[in-house]
């Protein structure tokens, strides 16, 4: 990753269930950008669900996968990247976020609970 800032690289951050994976494709479509969901990328490359990764190898290994996915996505311009809910809490990921615009999807914990309940 070059570390160069690009206005055509947009990171979506927010709590799990805040709508990053829903808003991301819509925003990408409007802007004629590519969309990347880092959780989906991790699941595709690892062959495991996020829950399975956490269970089998733990959060630290998951965060390493997440950082790799974010770096790969950030190599591109004209892209909207939905980051995992905890991604911004790790220093290495914060450096990647500095390479583009960051949009925080602000949602209350109560709304997240409602969203999760509706999904199940």
Where are these regions (language model features)?
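Hydrophobic anchor at the beta1->P-loop junction of P-loop NTPases
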Residues: 12
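P-loop (Walker A) phosphate-binding loop of NTP-binding proteins
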Residues: 15
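ATP-binding Walker
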Residues: 18
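Walker A/P-loop
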Residues: 21
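ATP-dependent small-molecule kinase phosphotransfer cores
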Residues: 38-96
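Conserved phosphate-donor/acceptor-positioning beta-strand/loop module used by diverse small-molecule
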Residues: 98-114
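Conserved small/polar residues in nucleotide/adenosyl-binding loops
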Residues: 115-120
């Amino acid at each position: 990753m070059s570390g160069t800032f690009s206005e055509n690289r947009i990171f979506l951050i927010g709590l799990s269930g805040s709508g990053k994976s829903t808003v991301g494709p819509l925003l990408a479509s409007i802007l004629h950008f590519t969309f990347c969901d880092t959780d989906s990328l991790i699941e595709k490359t690892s062959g495991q669900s996020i829950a399975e990764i956490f269970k089998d190898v733990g959060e630290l290994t998951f965060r390493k996968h997440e950082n790799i996915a974010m770096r790969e996505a950030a190599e591109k311009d004209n892209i909207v990247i939905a980051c995992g809910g905890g991604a911004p809490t790790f220093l290495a990921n914060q450096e990647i976020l500095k390479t583009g615009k960051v949009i925080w999807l602000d949602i209350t914990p109560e709304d997240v609970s409602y969203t999760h309940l509706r999904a199940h």
